[in-house]
Swiss-Prot record:
Protein name in UniProt: SsrA-binding protein
Function: Required for rescue of stalled ribosomes mediated by trans-translation. Binds to transfer-messenger RNA (tmRNA), required for stable association of tmRNA with ribosomes. tmRNA and SmpB together mimic tRNA shape, replacing the anticodon stem-loop with SmpB. tmRNA is encoded by the ssrA gene; the 2 termini fold to resemble tRNA(Ala) and it encodes a 'tag peptide', a short internal open reading frame. During trans-translation Ala-aminoacylated tmRNA acts like a tRNA, entering the A-site of stalled ribosomes, displacing the stalled mRNA.
Location(s), subcellular: Cytoplasm
Species of the source: Dechloromonas aromatica (strain RCB)
UniProt region (Disordered), positions on chain: 121-149
This protein's GO CC annotations: cytosol
Keywords of this entry: Cytoplasm, RNA-binding
Xref: Gene3D superfamilies: 2.40.280.10
GO molecular-function terms, A-Z: RNA binding
Length: 149
């Protein structure tokens, strides 16, 4: 079940591979995510010391959250993947010029998972071409719908 989708990532990048990663979260963050109080639009993944970290994901604390814990809505969160997956991703990002972008936040058996994509950036003309393709498909669907009436 998807919690939130980063639509901007598909607009700005060509996503070539997808990986599912766990996230190291605190209790108040899990409650806030379950309530839908997060944003992954401006977030990105970095590699530091052979580990992956999610930066810029904003989680707003609930009003009923604990007062004795300091809440940092945009703290850096560690991503949890298998060592083989991490080494493969590090190799591609460092050599081939790929970027790691968060695509989707969802539940798997009660656990919160983040789908990250191995992606290459789109140029402005690529974005325009994609927009034209979407428009033509939309027009074709509209014409088919009108024809059936």
């Amino acid at each position: 079940m998807s919690i939130t989708v980063n639509k901007k990532a598909f607009h700005d990048y060509f996503v070539e591979e997808k990986y599912e990663a766990g996230i190291s979260l605190e209790g108040w963050e899990v409650k806030a995510i379950r309530a839908g109080r997060m944003n992954i639009k401006e977030s990105y993944v970095i590699i530091k010391g052979g580990e992956l970290f999610l930066i810029g994901m904003h989680i707003s604390p609930l009003a009923t959250a604990s007062t004795h814990v300091s809440h940092d809505p945009t703290r850096t969160r560690k991503l949890l993947l298998h060592a083989k997956e991490i080494s493969k991703l590090i190799g591609k990002v460092e050599r081939a010029g790929y970027a790691l972008v968060p695509l989707d936040l969802h539940f798997v058996r009660g656990r919160i998972k983040l789908e990250i994509g191995l992606a290459k950036g789109k140029k402005q003309h690529d974005k325009r071409a994609d927009e034209l393709d979407k428009d033509s498909k939309r027009e074709a669907q509209r014409a088919m719908k009108e024809r059936q009436r």
